[in-house]
Amino acid sequence: MATSTLGRVAQALLAPALALGATVGLASAPASAAVWNSCDQWGNTSLNGYTLYNNIWGSGAGSQCVWANSGTNWGVWANHPNTGGIKSYPNAKKVVNKPITSLTSLTSNYNVTVPSSGAYNTSYDIWDTGYKYEVMLWVNKTGAVGPLGTSQGTVTLGGATWTVYKGNNGSNEVFSFIRSSNSGSGTVNILPILKWIKDTKGWFGNVTIGDVQFGYEITSSSGGLNFTTNNLTVSSS
């Protein structure tokens, strides 16, 4: 569930970083040497227009390391215990910073390799600039994980069919779209989803979209699991 999400965003911007699990850094590295890697709790860097975060924000977390060949090709090795509660959301962020009505397009392509075990979701996390509204798009999920809030039915938008949930985590409104079937690659047309929330449901107004994040919301990955973003692009105009 997307609880304490505002906290994880704020914490991901903090420095200095806290070292965590540095001895397992090599386990997270790709076959070829990455241009950047970090096992720090809040480790982050900027690469070709994207900002990468290790972002171990939940309580009871284990070890986690992130590596990157670029902002669009990166991965995570995580060893979090088999306990409840989200441990981390390692992600890549693209800044949009445009009101919805000023956008003519907002799309993303993704291609990931994810484990068959553990408990996690692969998701977009889209924020307004005031961090009052959070839109999550789950493209796949495994294990005992579920969205915050109550079901609002299903809708076909942006190239997929989703079950929609609406809730509040105490800090912000959360609108979660859970894809009807797991997908490891595809294209998401994000703008029609935002317009549906704004125009059809009226859940927010003409907010300014700040961040489009993409990553892995990990609850458990006992023994160490690899999550690889083979390719990610976020484009807006």
Report each predicted region and the residues it spans.
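N-terminal segment immediately downstream of the Sec signal-peptide cleavage site
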Residues: 34-77, 236-237
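Short, hydrophobic/proline-enriched secondary-structure or compact coil segments at domain edges
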Residues: 72-76, 104-110, 124, 209-218
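Bacterial N-terminal signal peptides that target proteins for export
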Residues: 2-14
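Long, compositionally biased interface segments
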Residues: 184-237
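Beta-sandwich interaction modules
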Residues: 85-100, 173-205
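Extracellular-facing segments of soluble proteins and assemblies that are Gly/Ser/Thr-biased and enriched
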Residues: 82-156
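C-terminal segment of classical bacterial N-terminal signal peptides
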Residues: 20-30
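Short helix-loop boundary/capping segments
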Residues: 129-191
